[in-house]
């Protein structure tokens, strides 16, 4: 009980002290999750309701908003907030008093949507700008009388910039499409948050390397420096990446995405013992059959390089669908045996959990790349980007699976799994140098593929917009290249 606007009402008394809260300095309403206790049974017969979510106006008595932080000299709104004995009505609970204790579900559903959009799209946009700028700059910048784009070392960095940007674009577009259709993709959102921000960091690093001295001198014409400085912010907020990789991606997906484990857990907790026993037996035998099927599929697909695996399309990307099928079966087999032999201890084996998460992530990202390619009309000129992206992702899945087996604590099980998963060894190869050269050509040559890769970047030709000015310089460079070549030849003579 407490006073609210002159009346005595039943409400909630809150205490909190949070250090790093995004938008806190400018917020008029705080979204607060807290554990709700009712020892006096004022709203029901329960002592502890658990996690509850409420909206608290920042002008409420007792709410303190601290000084704004200045993270890495970037204009990112973040700051502390605290509250001491803040009394608010029960109606401030999101959904009203009947939603007390249901805050965790709200948080997960909200995060499953927001986490898939905000930071991944920011990373994708940064990648598009970096790709567009780096491709043009590498052509314009001359070293030893030749464009640095012609140096294979620089080309290697340009390939990664373009390929990683394509992966981010695909992941964001496909996952956002699922959200538009009403899905709340908890596992894909965790995958996107981690991998898009990490790929964004790699793109920023490579773009800085390509630009060299131009990128490290701060000033009005430095279009990379601030973005490079801001990358750790995206890595940190909305769930630190180390935690996301080692616990969240596989930890959420193992039960949520498994066709039988969730049914087994629900049956085991059924209050009706007879019904629970029937459901558990049905799920258990289905699980056993599923494991045997995956063992056979994994062995056969690995032995035949998945050449006989049925796929929905007969296109130049057909083999990539087949390879995803192969590693999907291998992942399911490894995951089942990990849960069977390690049980609850698997969540403490964070290195193993992280590698399983890496495999799952690589397959999901490869799937989004193929879907994105289809959505954009199967443009043949984009095939080098698709091939580099999928090959890179599936090679990473293979290496993560190898590392998982190499470090699996039960060596007998690891040997058995290796026999079924890699009967011919690790046969999948990373992208070749020829593919990389084709990707470099796409990112450094004016054309549809270069424009599509950075289609959402602001490229208008106007004063103060470096992307538009770089593109104009690139077009002029291509137009006058024959004249420049004749001048160089005349100078030599």
Task: Give names to the regions the model predicted.
Residues 204-228, 404-417:
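A glycine-biased, small/acidic residue-tolerant capping/turn segment at secondary-structure junctions
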Residues 7-64:
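A short core secondary-structure module
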Residues 183-215, 384-397:
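Charged, glycine-rich active-site and insertion segments that engage polyanionic ligands
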Residues 140-156, 374, 378:
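Terminal amphipathic helices with adjacent charged low-complexity linkers/tails
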Residues 153-180, 198, 205-208, 361-372:
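Loop-to-helix element that buttresses phosphate recognition and phosphoryl-transfer chemistry
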Residues 286-493:
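C-terminal amphipathic alpha-helical interaction region
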Residues 82-115, 132-149, 171, 294-316, ...:
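A glycine-rich, basic-preceded beta-loop-alpha segment at the flavin cofactor/substrate interface
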Residues 61-87:
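Flexible, small-/acidic-enriched active-site or ligand-binding loops
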């Amino acid at each position: 009980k407490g006073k609210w606007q002159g009346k005595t009402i039943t409400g909630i008394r809150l205490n909190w002290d949070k250090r790093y809260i995004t938008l806190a300095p400018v917020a008029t309403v705080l979204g607060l999750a807290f554990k709700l206790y009712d020892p006096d049974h004022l709203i029901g017969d329960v002592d502890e309701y658990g996690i509850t979510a409420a909206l608290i106006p920042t002008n409420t008595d007792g709410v303190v908003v601290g000084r704004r932080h200045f993270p890495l000299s970037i204009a990112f709104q973040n700051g502390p907030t605290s509250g001491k004995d803040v009394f608010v009505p029960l109606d401030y609970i999101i959904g009203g008093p009947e939603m007390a204790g249901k805050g965790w579900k709200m948080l997960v559903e909200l995060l499953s949507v927001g986490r898939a959009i905000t930071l991944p799209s920011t990373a994708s946009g940064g990648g598009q700008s970096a790709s567009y700028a780096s491709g043009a700059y590498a052509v314009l910048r001359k070293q030893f009388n030749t464009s640095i784009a012609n140096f294979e070392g620089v080309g290697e960095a340009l390939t990664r910039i373009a390929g990683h940007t394509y992966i981010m674009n695909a992941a964001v577009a496909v996952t956002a499409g699922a959200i538009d259709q009403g899905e709340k993709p908890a596992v894909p959102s965790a995958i996107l948050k981690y991998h898009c921000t990490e790929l964004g960091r790699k793109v920023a690093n490579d773009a800085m390397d390509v630009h060299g001295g131009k990128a490290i001198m701060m000033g009005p014409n430095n279009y990379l420096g601030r973005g490079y400085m801001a990358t750790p912010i995206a890595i940190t907020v909305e769930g630190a990446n180390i935690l996301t990789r080692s616990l969240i991606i596989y930890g959420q997906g193992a039960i949520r995405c498994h066709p039988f484990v969730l049914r087994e857990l629900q049956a085991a907790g059924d209050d009706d013992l007879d019904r629970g026993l029937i459901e558990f037996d049905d799920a258990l035998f289905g699980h056993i059959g599923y494991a045997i099927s995956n063992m056979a599929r994994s062995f056969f697909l690995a032995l035949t390089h998945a050449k006989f695996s049925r796929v929905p399309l007969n296109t130049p990307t057909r083999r990539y669908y087949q390879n995803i099928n192969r590693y999907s079966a291998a992942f399911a087999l490894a995951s089942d045996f990990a849960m069977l032999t390690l049980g609850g201890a698997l969540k403490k084996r964070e290195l193993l959990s992280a590698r399983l998460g890496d495999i799952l992530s690589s397959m999901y990202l490869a799937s989004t790349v193929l879907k994105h390619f289809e959505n954009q009309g199967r443009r043949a000129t984009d095939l080098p980007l698709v091939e580099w992206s999928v090959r890179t992702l599936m090679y990473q899945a293979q290496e993560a699976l190898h590392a998982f087996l190499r470090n699996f604590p039960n060596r007998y099980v690891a040997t058995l799994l290796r026999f079924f998963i890699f009967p011919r060894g690790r046969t999948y190869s990373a992208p070749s140098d020829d593919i990389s050269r084709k990707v470099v050509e796409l990112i450094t040559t004016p054309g549809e593929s270069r424009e599509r890769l950075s289609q959402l970047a602001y490229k208008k030709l106007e004063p103060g917009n470096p992307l538009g000015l770089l593109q104009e310089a690139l077009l002029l460079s291509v137009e006058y290249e024959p004249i420049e070549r004749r001048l160089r030849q005349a100078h030599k003579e």
